[in-house]
Amino acid sequence: MNVGEVVQIIGVVVDVRFPPGQVPEIYNALTIETDKVDAFGRKFNLTLEVAQHLGNNVVRTVAMSTTDGLVRGAKVVDTGAPIKVPVGRPVLGRLIDVLGMPIDGLGDIKAETYYPIHRPAPALVDQSTKVEQLETGLKVIDLLVPFMKGGKIGMFGGAGVGKTVIVMELINNIAKQHGGISVFAGVGERTREGNELLLEMTEAGVLDKTMMVFGQMNEPPGCRLRVGLTGLCLAEYFRDEEGADVLIFIDNIFRFAQAGTEVSALLGRMPSAVGYQPTLATEMGQLQERITSTTKGSITSVQAVYVPADDLTDPAPANTFAHLDGTVVLSRQIAELGIYPAVDPLDSVSRILDPNVVGQEHYQVARGVQKVLQRYKELQDIIAILGMEELSEEDKLIVARARKLQRYLSQPFHVAEAFTGTPGRYVSLKDNIRGFQEILDGKHDGLPEDAFYMVGTIEEAVEKGKKILEAS
């Protein structure tokens, strides 16, 4: 057992000197015993991760929790391995932190298997290239931005446009409809949201199929930088050992890049564009390349991406783009119209919206919807200046259908039922395509626009439309 001592503390960066010939490897976990106890009455040991070798047997480390009360000369023990976390069935339904410690107050996790958080990506020969759509039950996503099983989907949006609510609805739908296992990695987001998510998932009865890892906004950057890797370990176990199709939700991948920026600056590296770390692309690649399908199973990821100041060219979202198979762009303009989920049907793209993958019918309906909405967007300037009267009859029809389509893209969510009072809806892909096809064909031109707002299937819209017409 190698024992060193603390020689310098600068915030969350701690320098440790070891005896000659006993210097720990990069990424090794070091522990410091303290006399503190955590919120659950457990003895609190501080964990450090080796980040740099400074020479003279000194290593520079990054703390995974607060260094309050730490003093120079404190004894540091090298564990001889990276941070290891419990994986497998015992972790289902539990909430853990970056070190794999339970933080839900439900007692210890009795796991037999532990994985190191730093693991290589699957080899090229082990990766699967099969392309298949994953049904989510959300109309706008299934039709226009189909998710690929084992793919990576980014959810882009500024503050308050509904990223987290969509993520929660997806967890709910996947667990209930597919019985799939989900991992939720809360990376540097609000503690309140994490608490709400835990309580709502317990109420919805989907927690037993989910594992949660939290490293919230109040945690040190070292923790926020590594919590995504902890979540990945949990998913990798089920993919590799049980051959399962796992979903991992990362909220928010931007905070991962942000934590990397903080750690990089604290370690004294020269910043690159906009103050980001010079290793941004490398760190992002190491995380993203582990999220993939193998011949045994798949990991599909949905990543919420906060866009600073709504600027998609910022290095953090721009670097994330490179890894994604699909991008769901959430628009403030659509949210302002009261249309939720506020997915932009023209900006959002998916690699598998291809007739060879989704089929000719699905492809043509999706492109038809986009064509009508695009034409409506082009006509909006004319309408604003000259009014609807100046449009040709054909354009008037396009505008009427576009407004119906726009409203039909909205959908009541199960997880928002408590706030909206409207029961949530899951719409199958078949019903979804049929509904949009009927609107495009003009079968419902006689119904008022409001009939299409916040409904599930087209039958509901027709019923709602009849009631509105009768009432008027």
Swiss-Prot record:
Q: Which GO terms describe its molecular function?
A: ATP binding; ATP hydrolysis activity; proton-transporting ATP synthase activity, rotational mechanism
**Entry keyword annotation includes Ribonucleoprotein:** no
Query: Where does it reside?
Result: Cell membrane
| Hydrolase keyword on record | no
Chain sites annotated for binding ATP: G157, G158, A159, G160, V161, G162, K163, T164
Species of the source: Desulforudis audaxviator (strain MP104C)
Q: Catalytic activity, per the record? A: ATP + H2O + 4 H(+)(in) = ADP + phosphate + 5 H(+)(out)
| Pfam families assigned to the protein according to its UniProt record, in alphabetical order | ATP-synt_ab (PF00006), ATP-synt_ab_N (PF02874), ATP-synt_VA_C (PF22919)
* Alphabetical UniProt keywords: ATP synthesis, ATP-binding, Cell membrane, CF(1), Hydrogen ion transport, Ion transport, Membrane, Nucleotide-binding, Translocase, Transport
**EC id:** 7.1.2.2
- Which InterPro entries did the record assign? AAA+_ATPase, ATP-synt_VA_C, ATP_synth_F1_bsu, ATPase_a/bsu_AS, ATPase_alpha/beta_chains, ATPase_F1/V1/A1_a/bsu_N, ATPase_F1/V1/A1_a/bsu_N_sf, ATPase_F1/V1/A1_a/bsu_nucl-bd
> What is the name of this protein?
ATP synthase subunit beta
Q: How does it assemble?
A: F-type ATPases have 2 components, CF(1) - the catalytic core - and CF(0) - the membrane proton channel. CF(1) has five subunits: alpha(3), beta(3), gamma(1), delta(1), epsilon(1). CF(0) has three main subunits: a(1), b(2) and c(9-12). The alpha and beta chains form an alternating ring which encloses part of the gamma chain. CF(1) is attached to CF(0) by a central stalk formed by the gamma and epsilon chains, while a peripheral stalk is formed by the delta and b chains.
What does the UniProt record say this protein does?
A: Produces ATP from ADP in the presence of a proton gradient across the membrane. The catalytic sites are hosted primarily by the beta subunits.
The UniProt entry lists membrane topology as: Peripheral membrane protein
Q: Which family does it belong to?
A: Belongs to the ATPase alpha/beta chains family.
